[in-house]
């Protein structure tokens, strides 16, 4: 996480799950973005095998599930996200009115940062991981504005 932006930061939690993050600042500044979910557009058959044929919307709707489905482990830690092992690419443009934001989840320890709206997702997307009550409220508020 202390490397230059544009690389993967992969770590192991709870003794059983990997988490995939995108390092997002200059070297020595520990900023990273946790990728909590994704909507598969290809490779879904292998994801089903890795996740033991869960319903498609449950294949990647959480950070641990995403890593299992994608075969992500510590070997990808530090990988260049413009390389050929793992990468992020533009797929479709999403209108800003379809992007919801709310507080992050699972960071009860973060005190002053716990309610910051630093979590973003596509509204009504079935692949989104769990949304907190505050996040759902923020999404409804955003929907009323559009």
Where are these regions (language model features)?
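Short, low-complexity, charge-dense intrinsically disordered segments
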Residues: 133-144
């Amino acid at each position: 996480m202390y490397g230059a932006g544009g690389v993967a930061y992969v770590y192991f939690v709870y003794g059983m799950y990997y988490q995939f993050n995108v390092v997002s600042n200059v070297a020595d500044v520990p900023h990273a973005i946790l990728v909590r979910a994704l909507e598969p557009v290809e490779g879904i058959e292998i994801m089903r095998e890795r996740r033991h044929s869960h319903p498609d919307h449950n294949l990647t709707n959480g950070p641990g599930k995403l890593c299992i489905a994608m075969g992500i482990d510590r070997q990808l830690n530090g990988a260049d996200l413009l390389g050929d092992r793992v990468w992020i690419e533009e797929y479709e443009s999403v209108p800003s009115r379809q992007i919801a934001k709310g507080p992050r989840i699972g960071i009860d320890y973060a005190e002053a940062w716990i309610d910051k709206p630093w979590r973003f997702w596509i509204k009504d997307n079935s692949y989104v991981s769990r949304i907190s009550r505050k996040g759902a409220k923020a999404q409804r508020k955003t929907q009323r504005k559009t």
